[in-house]
Amino acid sequence: MKRRHLLQGAAALAGASGFAAPSLAQPARTTTLRFVPQANLTALDPIWTSAIVTQMHGYHVYDTLYAVDGQQRARPQMAAGHEVSADGRVWRIRLREGLFFHDGEPVRAADCAASLARWSRRDAFGQILAAQVDEWRAVDDRTLEIRLKRPFPLLLDALAKPDSNVPFIMPERLART
């Protein structure tokens, strides 16, 4: 055996010995999410304040019927989709199946109607939309109907609004406050 082969084998054996070493102790898996906002969370209601920290908190607790995609187009979020009447004055938005709030209660169209009515009283874009709305109503538990005085082509853009006062859907009992 040549000396070179002996040295190569010894080097390979020394390098490989580290692979068999026991692993270091790993911390136990944790299920706690730590949230560190940029400011103190002084208000929990994302409709009655435009504070970014409250808006971010709102995104962790609530959801929206529509959201914008990467191309800034409104896409269904909680909604399964929508139908618009031929004259553009009646919008029916169908909720996806299996939607629940954090307390385990199912999301109903009545929650959506109350939430949107509340949001539209506070938000500037919502107020423009509300001026065109005759009625927000729940047809059944999964169908929201929005009746307009005249067509409002920006309705989905309003419902997908991602900033300032976001049209979050919350339980009816909270939205009625």
Model-derived regions, located:
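Short, glycine-/polar-rich solvent-exposed loops and beta-turns at beta-strand/coil boundaries
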Residues: 28, 75, 128-130
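Surface-exposed binding/hinge segments that line
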Residues: 128-177
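Aromatic- and charge-enriched surface segment that lines or borders ligand/interaction sites
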Residues: 80-125, 139, 145-147, 155
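N-terminal lobe/hinge region of extracytoplasmic solute-binding protein
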Residues: 36-86, 117
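N-terminal export signals
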Residues: 5-25
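Hydrophobic (often cysteine-bearing) scaffold residues that line and stabilize catalytic clefts
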Residues: 54-58, 108, 140
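Pocket-flanking alpha-helical
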Residues: 42-46, 68, 100, 123-128
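Short, well-ordered beta-strand elements
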Residues: 30-39, 90-92, 145
